[in-house]
Amino acid sequence: MNNKYQIAIDGPASAGKSTVAKIVAKDLQYVYCDTGAMYRVVTLKAIQNGIDLNDETKISEMLNDTDIRFEPGEPVQKVFLDGNEVTEDIRQANVTNSVSTIAAQKAVREVLTNWQRDLAKNGGIVMDGRDIGSAVLPNAEVKIFLIASVQERAERRYKENIAKGMETDLEQLKKEIEIRDHKDSTRKISPLTKASDAIEVDTTSMSIQDVVNEILRIVENASKRK
C-alpha cells in the first residue's frame, strides 16, 4: 500500500481501541498514538502534584512543563512522563476514574489536540480515542468507530486487571464503565462522537484478530477508492 493514511479509531471505554490500533499500526508499519494515554498522563501528574482536578488554570500551566513520550514495548507501548516510565501507573483506578474530568477541559484538549495533529500531519498513523475522527483528525482517510456491550467491556477490563494482579469486582467495573460512558458522551468539549463518515464495528462477539482483519479490510477498500 503506497498511500500513508491517517486512521482514526474511536469508541467508548474498553471497546478494544488501543489493543486493536496497536496491532493495525504494526501490520501497516504505521506510527501508533494512544491519545487516551496522553490524557491519563496529564491526570496522573495532576494527582501526583496535588492539583485540584477541576482547576483548569493550574492544570493548563502544568502542561507548559510536561513531557509525554511513547516507546515501543510488549505487550503494551511504554509511556513516559517527564522521563519516568508510567505505563502501569496511568492504568490504576484513581487515574481511570478521574481522567474524564481532565479530558473535559478545553485548555487541556487544545494543547493535546495540537500535539496529536502535529504527529499525524504526514499520515502513516493510527490514532485512537473518543473524538479522533470527529474533532482531532476530521479529514482522516479512514475512520472506525468500535462499539461493544457494557457487559463485554466490563469482562475485558476484569480480565486485564486479574492478569495484572489487581483485585477487582465485575459489577463495580460495569458501573464505572456506565458512568464513564455518560461523562464522555455528555461533556461539552469534544464529547464521545461517531463521525458521520465513520464505519461502525461491533466487537462484542469478535476476537481481537477478527477486529484487526476487519479494519485492515476497510483500509484496503479505502486504498482501492484512491
Swiss-Prot record:
Pfam families cross-referenced by the UniProt entry: Cytidylate_kin
Record's GO cellular component terms: cytosol
Keywords: ATP-binding, Cytoplasm, Kinase, Nucleotide-binding, Transferase
Residue sites binding ATP per the record: 11-19
GO molecular function: ATP binding; CMP kinase activity; dCMP kinase activity
Similarity section: Belongs to the cytidylate kinase family. Type 1 subfamily.
HAMAP family: Cytidyl_kinase_type1
Protein name: Cytidylate kinase
